[in-house]
Structure formats: C-alpha cells, structure tokens
From Swiss-Prot:
This is Zeta-crystallin. It comes from Bos taurus (Bovine). It comes from the Eukaryota. The lineage of its organism: Eukaryota, Metazoa, Chordata, Craniata, Vertebrata. Coiled coil: none annotated. It is found in: Cytoplasm. NADP(+) binds at residues 53, 158-161, 200, 229, 246-249, 269-271. The modification N6-acetyllysine is found at residue 23. SMART domains: PKS_ER (SM00829). The gene is CRYZ.
C-alpha cells in the first residue's frame, strides 16, 4: 500500500456464508476513479435481499473474494476519473450499482450507473431508489408490459420493491392491490398507491382477493416470494394474466394446467439483465416521477455500518417489511 494512501471503513466478505462473514475493517484503501468512473462519499446504502443471497454463495453472481457488498448508494461525488462529463465533485447522486461495493465510506461506480439525486429527496431516500425502483419499473413496464386500467397484485408490497411497484403502478393508471403481513405494513401499502390491501398471514386472504377482483381475476402479479405463493398466484390470474417473479427463496410445485386453461405466463425478472439503453429509459421515467412527486421512497429499518450483520439477519427473518432497509454511513 502506497504511503499516504487514504483509508476507509468498509464491510468485507472473505468467505461465503451466513451474516457472520460480514467483517468491518477500518484499513481499506479508498479506491481511485479511472476512466468513466466516479468516487462517491457514501451517506447511505440500501440493503437488499439479493445482498444476502450473494453473501451466502447461492446466487449466480459470485464476486471474487474478498469483496464489499452493496449496490445502491447515495452520497456526494468526491472525485471523477477521465472522460467523466456528467458529474463533478460535490454533486448529489445515487447509484444502481457499484464497482467497489456500497457498504463502505467511499464507493467507486461507473458513470453510467450514477444518477443525479434531486434536492427534494434526502440521502436515505436516495439509497432506496436504485435496486427497488429500477427493478419494479422493469417488472411492470418491461416484463409485464402493463396497460392503464389493468389490475396488478403486488404480493409482498410493504418492502422496498413492493412499495416502489405500488407507486409506479398507481402512477401508470393501474388498479393496485397489495399484501402485507402487519398492520403497519398494510397502512404503508395503502399510503403508497394501493387501492386495497390484504393480510397474507390470514388463512382466507386468497379468497378475499378473489372476491375483490371477481371472476375476471388479476391481470398481473408482482411476486416477491414465489416459492410460497406461485401456485396461488396462478389461480388468481385473469385469462392471459402474467406472474412476474421478482423474488424466490426455494422451490415450489405447481400444476402446469393452471397456466394452460388461462393461457397465462410466468416470467422471471432480474435487474442486471437490463441493457445500458434500458437503464437510461428506466432512469428517465423514474426521474420524472421524482419531479412530479409520485416517487417517494419509504425508509424502514436503519442500521449503522457496524451493524451490517444484524441488518442481514433481519432482512430475511423479520416478521414483516415496513419500507426500505438502509445502512447509514454519516
């Protein structure tokens, strides 16, 4: 390490495993931006379920060890590399991805994954945009190809992606139904775009949804936990309905006939299959939502960097989501 190189605190993962493999280090070198890269002084970083899958080694993304987790940071540009024209030191920004990892005091990011954070949103909200809103937008507009007037059920609507999906769906003229498992979660869902909300812990909640939507069924289901809900989802769909799988934590048995009779479809979505051009399209639509005011991230549990292990335990095992989980750096 060069003499005088600036150091920072960061979470490092030296082996794949449980939350306990997240190690806080205070002697990590601050990265230096290269061509088309920016260095961000991180104020907050989003914690996403995918972070835990990657950490455990069960995800198809397997970073070289050791690595620092974290995709969606919000902060202030500290330095820019060569050929960066869209940003300068001092700009407020958020990201959809980082190069060096977001669970750190500084994060390196490619300039095409960095976006201006409007003054009306604080850094906590900025850290809740990247993965949740871009994923929800891709699921609804790109994968499901929703149309105004259609109905959408957000199955697991009180977390980061769920709230984003409710807000986007309402803004685009859909009839929005959501589910949540706690009273607080249900309140948040109704406050953020849903016309109706159901408690998915109740034994008869599927019957209540069926009664609400009538014989036609639901046009689109945004599914956060497919290994639990997919079979029920197929029975809730309308003719030609679509289930978009955003999250799953295991396997499930389904009856393919349930798709045949309604000519329905199941489609998985992953944000990082998006092209640069698609990211630009998503960003333009979401930036408009920020300006108009319908895009307003809801912040849930907040943890200091040194509590990252607890955050990873809670995001998987909590009784019910209530907004986007974030790590605070400053």
């Amino acid at each position: 390490m060069a003499t005088g190189q600036k150091l920072m605190r960061a979470i490092r993962v030296f082996e794949f495993g449980g939350p306990e493999v997240l190690k806080l280090q205070s002697d990590v070198a601050v990265p230096i931006p290269k061509d088309h890269q920016v260095l961000i002084k991180v104020q907050a970083c989003g914690v996403n379920p995918v972070d835990t899958y990657i950490r455990s080694g069960t995800h198809n993304i397997k970073p070289l060890l050791p690595y620092t987790p974290g995709f969606d940071v919000a902060g202030i540009i500290e330095a820019v590399g060569e050929s960066v024209s869209a940003f300068k030191k001092g700009d407020r920004v958020f990201t959809t991805r980082t190069i060096s990892g977001g669970y750190a005091e500084y994060a390196l990011a490619a300039d095409h994954t960095v976006y201006t954070l409007p003054e009306k949103l604080d850094f906590k909200q900025g850290a809740a945009i990247g993965i949740p809103y871009f994923t929800a937008y891709r699921a609804l507009l790109h994968s499901a190809c929703v149309k105004p007037g259609e109905s959408v059920l957000v199955h697991g609507a009180s977390g980061g992606v769920g709230i984003a999906a409710c807000q986007i769906a309402r803004a685009y003229g859909l009839k929005v139904l959501g589910t949540a498992s706690t009273e607080e979660g249900q309140k948040i869902v109704l406050e953020n775009g849903a016309h109706k909300v159901f408690n998915h812990k109740e034994a008869d909640y599927i019957d209540k949804i069926k009664k609400s939507v009538g014989e036609k069924g639901v046009d689109v289901i945004i599914e956060m936990l497919a290994n639990v809900n997919l079979s029920n989802d197929l029975n809730l769909l309308s003719h030609g309905g679509r289930v978009i799988v955003v999250g799953s934590r295991g396997t499930i048995e389904i009856n393919p006939r349930d798709t045949m009779t309604k000519e329905s479809s199941i489609k998985g979505v992953t944000l990082f299959s998006s092209t640069k051009e698609e990211f630009q399209q998503f960003a333009a639509a979401l930036q408009a939502g920020m300006e108009i005011g319908w895009l307003r991230p809801v912040i849930g549990p907040q943890y200091l960097l040194e509590k990252a292990t607890q955050a990873h335990e809670n995001i998987i095992h909590s009784s019910g989501a209530t907004g986007k989980m974030i790590l605070l750096l400053n």
